[in-house]
A protein has these predicted regions:
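Conserved metal-binding segment of the jelly-roll/cupin
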Residues: 123-143, 153
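Short, solvent-exposed loop/turn segments at secondary-structure junctions
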Residues: 111-112, 119-121, 138-139
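A short beta-loop-beta micro-motif enriched in histidine and acidic residues
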Residues: 87-101, 116-117, 124
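A short, N-terminal "cap"/entry segment at the start of jelly-roll beta-barrel domains
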Residues: 2-92
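Short, conserved beta-strand element in jelly-roll/cupin
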Residues: 95-112, 130
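Double-stranded beta-helix
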Residues: 80-81, 87, 106-108, 114-116, 140-187
Length: 187
């Protein structure tokens, strides 16, 4: 299924179709984020200073548009390069030097964040989750339609993080230090 999704994405990029920037901005809903800070659990380092940030129902998805394309346009316009369509692995893992943003394009899932001693959070179509480098994540269950996650991973952390999670009257001032290449550590 993900091969088909990625093929569709490639064709749309070549022929120049997809949601317009205006349609993408209309889809964004201002939401107050929920945050969680996880401690090192001995296996998963998590991030000692930056919280996981979860925006519920942050993107209005319509049946007329490819929901994954809306997330791709939104994330790429905010500095998150290299988007891809995939799911969350069913084993605990983390990215030691790269922040990640997840856009749930369809379906619903239960995801454990923060390692085995972390927290299981339900995510649904339209949700956005920002994971700072080191944050463990694992798919526990997903709906039959295969909760479609759009997971851009980038090495341009600071501008992207600030633009994704800033809102009227508030701004997270994060100062991450990381190398320029993505890295995934499986537990």
């Amino acid at each position: 299924m993900y091969m088909i999704e990625n093929l569709k994405k490639a064709v749309k990029q070549v022929i120049g179709t997809g949601p317009s920037p205006a349609a993408t901005q209309v889809a964004v809903r201002r939401r107050k984020p929920q945050t969680a800070l996880f401690k090192d659990d001995g296996t998963v380092p998590n991030n000692p200073t930056l919280p996981l940030v979860h925006y519920r129902n942050a993107v209005r998805l319509t049946n007329s548009e490819d929901p994954a394309a809306i997330f791709e346009r939104l994330f790429e316009s905010n500095g998150w390069k290299g988007t891809w369509r995939d799911g969350i692995y069913d084993y605990m893992h983390y990215h030691s030097n790269t922040h990640e943003v997840l856009g749930i394009a369809r379906g619903e899932a239960r995801v454990r964040f923060g390692g085995d001693k972390g927290k299981v959070i339900a995510v649904n179509a339209g949700d956005v989750v920002v994971l700072p480098a080191g944050t463990g994540h694992q798919r526990i269950s997903a709906s039959r339609d295969g909760a479609g996650f759009i997971r851009p991973c980038t090495s341009k952390q600071l501008p992207a993080l600030q633009s994704v999670i800033s809102g009227p009257g508030r701004s997270f001032r994060w100062s991450p230090r990381a190398s320029s290449s993505a890295h995934c550590d499986r537990i």
